[in-house]
Amino acid sequence: MIVVLKHNVPEEKRNQLINWLKAQGLDVHPSLGEYQTVLGLVGDTSRLDMSLLESLEIVDSVKRVTDPFKCCNRKFHPDDTVVQVGDVRIGGGNFVMIAGPCSVESEEQIVYVAKAVKAAGAQLLRGGAFKPRTSPYDFQGLHEQGIRLLEIAKQETGLPIVTELMNIKHLPLFENVDVIQIGARNMQNYDLLKEMGSVKKPILLKRGLANTLKELLMSAEYIMASGNDNVILCERGIRTFDDYTRNTLDLAAVPMLHELSHLPVIVDPSHSTGINRLVPPMTLAAAACGADGVIVEVHNDPIHALCDGAQSLTCEQFAEVARKVRAVRKAVAE
């Protein structure tokens, strides 16, 4: 249920209503907009008298929300959420480029790539330290050493770092990580999602390879209902019957998610295609369809990469894509 308050309601009266609603056993999520305030109610609202609420002088309207996701629902929070990562704002009309290697391999590699992507316009550095691989025989990442190397790259460049958390026992290693990524394979690891609710860091939540948008939003709901509103959604391709690309990039999900939710939505053109020559056009398509950013894999020597070299751009290719993204964003804005 949502309660829309009239314009310019005094704070004292608003708080009186919020406290009364909490006394009814409900969680209240206020969204203070420029022109109206919306109170999102989570819990058993079946016994609330809608006509009584509507009769209050400070209430404009009351609506029941049938969607199972509440906290991330745009009806609860009409304005776009902007996730702040240092000086970087994700959402609210900004377009953020997150770039870096699939896996951290060495100090020389990660520092070189970090400097290159920053020079090209990337605002955040991605890099895998713990790698979930389909085969147990593939490179699994440098683990704790990989985190330390990311921290060195952060010190060298000032770029905030994004890396994947697979197991809650590794969380103490992530103290200097700026954005924690929950990968596609863990999108429905509900115990892990609930733990992310108590983490005071932004969470980048990737859509699972066979999950619906509702399931993605319900996973975001787990994090938000547990106390962390700083969630970034990521469309990274879904499994379909076609096998020319690794996955099928569902770009229609971007405007649909923006319609359903107030959370920022970014796109992963690397994992969704699996082919580096397809990454540039899909990056531009993401910029054109209204995404709030992209997360792109970049490697200084893709042919010899220990992980996913086939989908990685060279530093020079990324610089060219970043230049074109700026042109697309300008054209879309006009």
Language model feature labels by segment:
Residues M1-M97:
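Non-catalytic terminal accessory/regulatory regions of metabolic enzymes
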Residues V85, M224-A286:
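Active-site/ligand-binding-proximal alpha/beta "capping" segment
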Residues F95-Y112, P136-Q140, P160-E164, G183-R185, ...:
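Active-site mouth loops of central-metabolism enzymes
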Residues V96-P101, L125-G127, I161-T163, I180-I182, ...:
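Hydrophobic faces of well-ordered beta-strands that scaffold small-molecule active sites
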Residues G121, L173-Q181, G197-I203, M224-N230, ...:
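Glycine-enriched alpha-helix->loop->beta-strand junction motifs that scaffold or abut catalytic
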Residues R126-E144, N300-S312:
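Glycine-rich, proline-tolerant flexible connector loops at the mouths of alpha/beta enzymes
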Residues A129-R133, N186-A252:
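Conserved anion-binding
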Residues F139-T163, E195-P202, L251-V265, Q311-A333:
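Alpha-helix-loop-beta-strand connector modules within alpha/beta enzyme cores
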